[in-house]
């Protein structure tokens, strides 16, 4: 696969009133090929979420360049989907309307929704939304429910469907499963990895959990800081080959132990979670 994303000497610095500028990322270099599943680990405050926002186009670097398909990063568009840790569904819209809102607004805006053509396209959008509902393991009866009638896991499935209906080339997921209970979290991991295998979408998934990263990723990228006052950068990368996985798709326990040791040694004392029993195959 060819190169899709390139981060070149990225620096991000925030100005704060009455304090010295806070540098979050410094000299960060990373290249990602089309179709990769990149799991991003690192201690709190090392710039993982900032990196996702840069790729999304929601934030600009202070230094360096973000390239998508060889082009300087444009504004956010449908080619980059985003699933945050706390899903942001519209509470006054049904599940179906939450999913179709993005493509409807992109194609028609507010005024365009008054045209006859919108009514035709809306039927098409809703048919597509039903397909993603099924793909996410939701029932047809869930389509007309409101977010507060759904469990946390079901709401997160809707949030992923919101992103997928835009058919992004790149899907950015920022600790998207961290608030879920272990059983739901495991279900969502399997679901997302299956979607990745079927669609070939390039995914960047931020997590604090090493075992989760090793299960999901084809490559684990560790961000870290040399000291508490330093800024984040890539300090370690590890490919996760298919040969390390058991029949279930999870890495075998001995492989998790081996790769976890490599990552922890590179983490320079940063706290990372390891919930091995839950993920080991």
Regions found by a protein language model. Give the residues of each.
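The feature captures the beta-strand-to-loop junction immediately N-terminal to the Walker
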Residues: 41-43
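Helix-to-loop junction immediately C-terminal to a conserved catalytic motif
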Residues: 56
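Conserved ABC transporter NBD signature motif
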Residues: 64-75
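Short helical segment in ABC ATPase nucleotide-binding domains corresponding to the A-loop/adjacent helical element
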Residues: 96-104, 112-116
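Conserved ABC ATPase "signature" region
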Residues: 112-141, 194
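Conserved ABC ATPase signature
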Residues: 146-150, 154
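A short, proline-enriched helix->beta-strand linker immediately N-terminal to the Walker B motif
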Residues: 165-169
């Amino acid at each position: 696969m060819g190169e899709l994303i390139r981060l070149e000497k990225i620096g991000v610095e925030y100005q704060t009133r009455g304090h010295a500028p806070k540098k979050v990322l410094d000299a960060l270099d990373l290249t990602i090929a089309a179709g990769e599943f990149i799991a991003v680990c690192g201690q709190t405050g090392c710039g993982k979420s900032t990196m996702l926002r840069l790729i999304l186009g929601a934030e600009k670097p202070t230094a360096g360049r973000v390239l998508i398909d060889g082009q300087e990063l444009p504004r956010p568009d449908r080619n980059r989907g985003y699933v945050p840790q706390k899903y942001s569904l519209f509470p006054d819209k049904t599940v179906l309307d939450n999913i179709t809102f993005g493509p409807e607004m992109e194609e028609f805006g507010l005024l365009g929704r008054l045209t006859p053509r919108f009514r035709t396209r809306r039927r098409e959008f809703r048919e597509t939304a039903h397909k993603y509902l099924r793909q996410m393991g939701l029932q047809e009866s869930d389509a007309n429910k409101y977010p507060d009638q759904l469990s946390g896991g079901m709401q997160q499935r809707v949030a992923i469907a919101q992103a997928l209906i835009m058919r992004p080339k790149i899907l950015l997921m920022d600790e998207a499963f961290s608030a879920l209970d272990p059983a739901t979290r495991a279900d969502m991991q399997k679901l997302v990895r299956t979607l990745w295998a079927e669609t070939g979408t390039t995914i960047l998934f931020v997590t604090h959990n090493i075992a989760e990263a090793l299960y999901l990723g084809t490559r684990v990228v560790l961000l870290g800081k040399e000291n508490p006052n330093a800024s984040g950068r890539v300090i370690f990368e590890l490919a996760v080959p298919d040969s390390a996985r058991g029949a279930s798709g999870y890495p075998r326990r001995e492989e998790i132990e081996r790769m976890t040791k490599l990552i922890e040694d590179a983490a320079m004392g940063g706290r990372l979670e390891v919930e091995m029993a839950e993920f080991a195959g």
